[in-house]
Amino acid sequence: MALDIHAHRILILDFGSQYTQLIARRVREIGVYCELHPFDMDDEAIREFAPKGVVLAGGPESVHEADSPRCPQAVFDLGVPVFGICYGMQTMAEQLGGKVAGSELREFGYARVDVVGKSRLLDGIEDHIDADGLFGLDVWMSHGDKVTKLPENFHILASTPSCPIAGMADDARGYYGVQFHPEVTHTKQGGRILSRFILDICGCEALWTPSKIAEDAIAQVRAQVGTDNVLLGLSGGVDSSVVAALLHKAIGDQLTCVFVDNGLLRLHEGEQVMAMFAENMGVKVIRANAEEQFLNNLAGESDPEKKRKIIGRTFIDVFDAESCKLDNIKYLAQGTIYPDVIESAGAKSGKAHVIKSHHNVGGLPEEMNLKLVEPLRELFKDEVRRLGLELGLPYDMVYRHPFPGPGLGVRILGEVKKEYADLLRRADHIFIEELRKADWYHKVSQAFVVFQPVKSVGVVGDGRRYAWVVALRAVETIDFMTARWAHLPYELLETVSGRIINEIEGISRVTYDVSSKPPATIEWE
C-alpha cells in the first residue's frame, strides 16, 4: 500500500494574522502536512480532518471585546496537543478559564523573554543563559493584550517585564501558548520551537518531503486522468513549468501544451521554453506565434488596466483557437497553488473546501467541457520550486524572478510598440546578465527594466542625439506585500548603464528606481 503523506497532519486555524501563511510554510518545512482554515471551521469538518495537533494563529482582535473570534470547542474535544500563538494563546486562555486584559505597555518588535518554567516545549531551547542560570530567548512580539490569569492546570512558561505570562503550558494535555511569534525569522529559535511541538509533542513523522510529494502527485494525476488527454497553457513561468514537468512524468504523451508567444516575452524566452520542454524533455508543445495579433490589439492604448485586459482577452482568443484544433482533450491543467486556494476560500466562511475555480487560462469555450486538474493546489510557492528541482528542472528556471502575466506590456509605460519591446528586451537582458555576473541575481527578489516613452538628449561622439530613457528596478522582499529598493553597488549600476547605452542604439539614459513599497508598487504599471 502506498505511503499516505497526508496521514500525519496539523490543523492551523486563522484568526486574521498577517503571519498565518508563514506558520503553515514553517510546518511544511519541518516535513509535516498542514492545512489552513478559518477560525470558525465547522465542528464536523474539524473531526473529519483528524489532525495530530492544532495551531491557533494570531489575529488583530481583542479577546475581551464582544464578538471577537473564538476557537471551536471541537478543537479542545479532540484530545490532541494545541499550540496558541499570540491571539491564539489569549483565546485559549480565556476559553479554558483564564483571563485576558489590555496591556498598558504594548510590545511590537524584538523582545527578550525569560524562560521561567519547565516544559516539553521549551526545555533545552535558549539564546542566552544568564550568570544566575536564567534562560532567555530573543523573540518577535506584536501584541497589545496579555493573559493576566492562567487557566486551571497551566503554569507560566516565559515572561517579560511588561508581560508576566508570555508563555504558558499544560504538559499533561499538551496545551501550550506563547505571546511571541515563533514563525517569523526574527525569533531565532522559532524553528526549533515549532519542530518540538510538531514532531515531539504531536508525534508527527516528517513524511512531507519533495520526493514523496512528487511520487504522491504523480499517483494522484494518474488516478484522476486515467487514459484521457490533458491540455496545459505553458507560459514559461515557474508554476506552469512545474505542472508541465509533473504531468509529463505522470502521463507522457497524454499531455499537450500550448505556448502562446505574445511578443512581450524576455529575450530568447520562447526559444528557451521550446528547448527545455519540447527538445530536452520530449513534451508535446504547440507554439502559437501571436506577436502581431497582440501588438495590433494593443495599438493606441496607453491605459495600464485596459492594456492588461486586452492582453488577457487576446491570450484567451489565441489559446482557444489552438485548443479547438485538438481532439479528445478531456482535462485542462492549471498551476493553481495553495495561496490561491486560501484566498478563494475566504476568511470566516467556514467552508474552505468549497473553492471557486481559478481560471488561469480564462474563459474556454463551454463546448469543450473540460474538467480541471490542479496538481499544485496543496503547495506553497517555495514548495513548488523544490518540487521543480525534484522533477529535474534547472535551478535557474525554478528560481527565476517573477514575471508579470502581461509580460513587457506593463513594463512599457503607455502605448506598446514593437520597437519599444525590442529595446526593452535587450536592456533587461543586459541588466539580468550583469546581476548574475556580480552574484547579485539571487540576492534580490526581483529585478527588471522599465521603458519610459520619453526622449532625452545624449552625446555620441561629436554629435547630440535624442533617444529613449529606461529605468532599472531591483527590490528585496519576503512576501511581495512590502519591498525595499535594493542597494546595488554603484560599480554594478555603472556597468549596467554603460552597457545599455553603448550597446543599444535608441537608449540615451538609464535611471535607477529608489522607491520602496509602499508607497510605490513593485511594477510601474
Swiss-Prot record:
One of its GO terms (cellular component) is cytosol. Residues 208-400 form the GMPS ATP-PPase domain. InterPro entries: Class_I_gatase-like (IPR029062), GATASE (IPR017926), GMP_synth_C (IPR001674), GMP_synth_GATase (IPR004739), GMP_synthase (IPR022955), GMPS_ATP_PPase_dom (IPR025777), NAD/GMP_synthase (IPR022310), Rossmann-like_a/b/a_fold (IPR014729). Transmembrane segments: none annotated. Keywords: ATP-binding, Glutamine amidotransferase, GMP biosynthesis, Ligase, Nucleotide-binding, Purine biosynthesis. One of its GO terms (molecular function) is ATP binding. CDD domains: GATase1_GMP_Synthase, GMP_synthase_C. It is an enzyme of class 6 (ligase). Pfam families: GATase, GMP_synt_C, NAD_synthase. Gene3D superfamilies: 3.30.300.10, 3.40.50.880, HUPs (3.40.50.620). The keyword Transmembrane helix does not apply. The keyword ATP-binding applies. It catalyses: XMP + L-glutamine + ATP + H2O = GMP + L-glutamate + AMP + diphosphate + 2 H(+). Its EC number is 6.3.5.2. Residues 9-207 form the Glutamine amidotransferase type-1 domain. PROSITE patterns: GATASE_TYPE_1, GMPS_ATP_PPASE. The active site is at 86 (nucleophile), 181, 183. ATP binds at residues 235-241. Pathway: Purine metabolism; GMP biosynthesis; GMP from XMP (L-Gln route): step 1/1. NCBIfam families: guaA_Cterm (TIGR00884), guaA_Nterm (TIGR00888), PRK00074.1 (NF000848). Catalyzes the synthesis of GMP from XMP. Homodimer. This is GMP synthase [glutamine-hydrolyzing]. It comes from Pseudomonas syringae pv. syringae (strain B728a). The gene is guaA.
